């Protein structure tokens, strides 16, 4: 690095603690963060300020290292700065940072996706999962001529006004409107029901079916805990929706390319009309997309009348890092290995935890996702079934692990993730640390 370029780098944070930086941040940013859950408001305390990451490890401003099970809330399925993906990113930096034009990199990623997902006949890239959902729902309204959108209590689909109604973890415990500043007209056409109740869905469609443009659901709800749904329930609600001419949108921003190349749609054998993706498809860069039936995507401008655009959509870093990530995941056959490793890890963690505390915990896992929660007599499929005291109990577990260098997402309603970098030696190290840490509870 030349002296000239080094002058452009600001390192005013060096020598400061997380506590000091948080106080500075609160002066210039709302709550000191740029996404609410990062503030530690769900678990209490001061958020840790991280400055670097590699593999399964985060390093904070003081130089302390942590094994990371948050992984930027899901995108980093290969771990931080996977060497092969990093090589692609460095090469991209020498080519272009942004075009705002047609380019071949988005073509390659789109072809990769459509070649592996039969129902993804066309793809449109955007910059986030929220944008993907917003755009997909606009398409459903244009295609059906209907106004209403039907979602489920506890499923989070981004921070667009119409769907911030009984949403996910960052809103857990807040008012029923979920956010100030949302007009009544914005949510007037949003219908909401609890998960895991086919009869309620049937009754809703009997009265409103002809007005519902889209049924949107996370087929693996993972924003208010890990609420694994019955396949029978998912099959039935799709059947009901299709009977009434309602388009089915699967929000696979988290589960897409996390549960396998075809996501939950493939595992369930369900062909949704539209699917939204994000997180993993960008390889750690801000990317989202919506994909699905050719006739529906052809409604999007410039092919059709549905307008959607974005200055940084299909940015070369996200396209190339995303493609490299997916190619490596496919080449190394990571999914089955990660599924077994995740279940083994989560079960062992709970076994250690239950041996050190009078509270009984259990692990819920799916693919490479996990969720620690208070033990219940029945499967938890709805938010009203989450046991009382879970949030407070998780906060205690979170802080004792954080103190000992294990970083979970800072909310009892967020899920955890394993990456390809969480190999057997990393897991063994974490279990050894946790065994000692839980004695502090």
Swiss-Prot record:
SUPFAM superfamilies: PLP-dependent transferases. Homodimer. The keyword Cytoplasm applies. Its main location: cytoplasm. The gene is hemL. This is Glutamate-1-semialdehyde 2,1-aminomutase. It comes from Leptospira borgpetersenii serovar Hardjo-bovis (strain JB197). Coiled coil: none annotated. It is found in: Cytoplasm.
